[in-house]
Amino acid sequence: MPVIKLKGINVDFPFTPYPCQEDYMSKVIECLQKKVNGVLESPTGTGKTLCLLCSTLAWRDHFKDTISARKITERMGGAELFADRPMSSWGTAATDGDTPTYYTDIPKIIYASRTHSQLTQVVNELKNTSYRPKICVLGSREQLCINQEVMRHESNHIKVHMCRAKVSSRSCIFYNNVDEKSTDKEIVNSILDVEDLVKTGKKQRVCPYYLSRSLKQHADVIFMPYNYLLDPKSRRAHNIELKGAVVIFDEAHNVEKMCEESTSFDLTPHDLISAIEAVDRLLREQASDISKADSAEDFNVESLNSGLKMDITTIAKVKQILMDLETAINDFEMPANNQGITKPGSFIFELFEMANVNSKTKTETVEAMEQITGYLAGRPGVFLNTSGLQKVADIIQLVFVAEPAEGSKKSQTGNSLKEFKVHIHPDNSNFKKKQITDVWASSSTKKQGNVLSYWCFSPGFSMQELLRQEVRCIILTSGTLSPLSSFTCEMQIPFPVSLENPHVIQRDQIFVSIIEKGPDGVQLSTAFDRRFVPENMSSMGNTLVNLSRVVPHGLLVFFPSYPVMDKTLEFWRAKGHADRIENVKPMFVEPRGKGTFTEVIDGYYGKVDDPNSSGGSFFAVCRGKASEGLDFADTYGRGVVITGLPFPPRMDPRVVLKMQYLDEMCRNKISGVKYLTGQEWYRQQASRAVNQAIGRVIRHREDYGAIFLCDHRFKSADARNQLPSWVRPYVKIYDGFGTMVRDVAQFFRTAQKTRPVPVKKGKAEGHENQADTRLLNTGSSCLTKSVWPSDIYQKAKTLDAHVPSLKRRKLDSEEHSGREGAARLCIQYEMEMTSKRKPVSLLDALDDTTDKEEREDTMVGEERASHLSTLSLQHDKRLDDESRGGKRKIKVVQERETVTSHTAKTGKAFMMELRRCLSHENFKLIMEALQSYKTADNLNNLLATVAEPLIQDHNTHSLLRGLYQFIRPHHKKEYDERCLELTGEGCGYKQEHSLSREEKEALRHNSVKAEIPPVNPPIEQLNSSRLLNQGGSHLGTIQLNGGEVNVRSEEQKPQTSIKEGPSCSSLLSDIKQAIGAEKTRQMFSALQAYKTSNNYEQMVSTVVSLLTERDEDIALLERLSVLIRPQHRKQFGELLKSLTGNDSAVVQDSDIGSSQQLSYLEERLNARYRPSFHECC
């Protein structure tokens, strides 16, 4: 490996670095040597992670050599150990004036990133270097525990208490082996990520969680998610020592948000009620046991249950605290506008004082709550929700985290809480409070509860806390930190070292365009007053239709928010824009839930990889999962469209208070401290979200792509200045849409000719965990190559379950049977099922009165997303199941068989998920309730039984909604309403769900009778100008007995040459009919100018913009080719090819010269529209 010398440090690097990489490593070393903080931005694909690791570890080795040289010098009495290498050259890293003396002075490196998947990628990069430090990766029990008795529980806090109980009693065989295995050299000297730790733990029968904590003591580099550092409770729980450590935050664009959220909370009425109920249940049991005692002499409270070491009075005190806290919160009268009440941060202590919780009582209160939680969590029998009680205990610790045991009033209300606000507002959730008959069980069951919010508005609060721990330095780095000035202001700590690195790509690899107006001339905007205007949404749809034609392979489209995306897609479906996009690039929509994300993204990847497809389009939101961590390298992201500026919700109380806080800080103007104004922060939030979405494309040095900013507000200098520094030089604003289309088509033609084709990995090689690996931030080395997935088409069927209105027309015509099944699977939204099968599982049998078609129809909208999320159909598991054959095998032959096969599996898959998520007792309880419902047909009894175990934990709400598929038709509406009351979300009920199977059959039979039979052979109706596998409409309009039968409207077959003069008359008539008189006048003015000036560029930009607003007008553009002069025809033909994707769209020489055609056309115009050609139309 090459050795590069930077600032006196020899850095081993895997290859010769680029100048931008050397600059980056120099800045890192400068921070380490001078003990100063740094903020470093380097675009994805520039090898940021590799540079960070190599420079940091090289400096650490040099630091260690400094100590070695000093010790040897002392022993040698000043003599040189090697004549040709003076000891002064061994290590002179201490340029900060310090002279390290002991090896214990060597700083630990704490490397934090947002998620474990990103940390896994970093660890894999470390394996590619020559450095072999001792490392450990810290994770939660959720990721690392291998004890099945603990992992079978639903809630994370229950797993924590179960684990602690087993550890304290030494009943966990895996924990008992930790001491022995933690010194194993094979483990200590290996570089293990989370997955490797789990594999090692299972193989060696040692607990990975406690093994990682043991390895931490002697590790040189400690990897962890950055909430472990920023959350004081987590930092204390993991015993993270920060003094003298180097702290690195990778992917730091989220640090600002995490800093605020780690010290904030929202306490809802539901949390308090569930906490009171849990303590009340225990109190009743203990009181009952006392009453059963034979005599007072024989009574011993602790002997009632050896697991609970507290008396009944302590339990009663805890309950009283909870009730007093609930009363204190709910006693506030809300203002008429229902906006809530805001208090200073110090008010939180007054509020808790009302419940007798203060700095003196906090410790015993928290210990009592955690002991109760631990006891209830480990108790066998019916599950009792203790999440609310655990949350209250965590909140008390958070509020009093900085308070000493004997804290004074002054310390509580001092200047340190200026960053916090207390906000009390009505609970507007759909959670319906359960009525409690015991008057002592809740103090406010008759009134709507209030939510207590305690919000931090300064990320600098957490950053300053890290500095108080005496860290050596803090380095923040990411691919998108721009604008840097506002970012550093928010952190409120000094950053003497900063860097905005350029990209390693060349000019011909990036195309950036600000699109102010759509092809129809309507200004594009997602401002609050414009976002849902029909003309605006239509223009945006037309823009995307055109871009989908010229951008090859994968196209990414980002919306400002989910509501904007949902309403826009609904409009496009109703008006036909979505169908036109589908014809070129099948649409895949980012789901809100986590469960189906892998399914949808795999479908998108598979469609892009399909050699018979023109690619796919992926619709997502800024700040969503796809915009944050997904890799769309190479063909998966050739273009990214930003449909607007994603400003935060302006009237949200937290946003309003944040802006007020910043404005207040600016007015007070503390010397030496710079604050953003509220408006600057508001704009920065939108800019940073845009920059993060832009970063999804151009992921390595050979990648290329286009960025389209589709909002007129991007034209402002302020908006452009907040774009990443590597993007700003290439931004171009176009006056005409047609000119932009021409340039981007030329850009991709050039790039495809000059850039190497991405290396596609084989099916076996690139198949495993493809979706998970793309969640990692690949491209950390500029040698990154894309990983191509295998074709996984059947998963894409769920892509639009998340937008209720997006349901594609049923493809039940015989003409579709010859179409490629895989392509149809990717674009289908809804399908009719016709094959009848016997019930294949118990749950199928329970609802034998409802056929499988109804099951598919009942799961619509958000409910289908929730249902699928419970199936946990991870990529590997699906592959394994399908490879076994039998009834689980999906044979992609024709659509009906595939859908039937999938639906037959849903009952069994749901049953498996129910069994996996619930305890054995609760699963058995629900199955008995379903059997009873089958025989008694009593919905109330069913709900009374199944609701209790399924509504306690938010994670199991989707299971309650998932049972909707087994509810009989006459109960579906009521069940949907009850689910809405209990979980805040319905099941997607539609009126047709209440129809019985017989009623549905009758409706279907009547609709079949009403259908018009084909009047001509199918071959006569097919339009050969569009490939059938592109998913578009393809049947034309036919005449029958003088009347018109509209089968499926479609444009005429394009003509490539016009040999007769009179054809110009027909062309003129067709154009005027298609685009109207005004636009026809504009077009022929441009053609007349072309005839006289021979200015092809000016003519084509006008003509293309006018004739690409609708799909059917493309044929007219092709017919205009006869008017193009010979020297321009090749160029015009390439433009047509890029717009249509049709190789046959080649401009032929006509028998009549183009000048003659233009003259003839002018004559026709003069004859029809007097007085002159220029005043035509």
From Swiss-Prot:
The keyword Nucleotide-binding applies. [4Fe-4S] cluster binds at C145, C163, C172, C207. ATP binds at S42, P43, T44, G45, T46, G47, K48, T49. Its main location: nucleus. It catalyses: ATP + H2O = ADP + phosphate + H(+). It is found in: Nucleus. SMART domains: DEXDc (SM00487), DEXDc2 (SM00488), HELICc2 (SM00491). The keyword tRNA-binding does not apply. Keywords: 4Fe-4S, ATP-binding, DNA damage, DNA repair, DNA-binding, Helicase, Hydrolase, Iron, Iron-sulfur, Isomerase, Metal-binding, Nucleotide-binding, Nucleus. Residues 7-302 form the Helicase ATP-binding domain. Coiled coil: none annotated. GO terms for cellular component: nucleus. GO terms for biological process: DNA recombination; DNA repair; DNA replication; negative regulation of DNA recombination; negative regulation of t-circle formation; regulation of double-strand break repair via homologous recombination; telomeric loop disassembly. Residues 847-869 are annotated as: Disordered. PANTHER family: DNA REPAIR DEAD HELICASE RAD3/XP-D SUBFAMILY MEMBER, REGULATOR OF TELOMERE ELONGATION HELICASE 1. NCBIfam families: rad3. This is Regulator of telomere elongation helicase 1. It comes from Danio rerio (Zebrafish). The gene is rtel1.
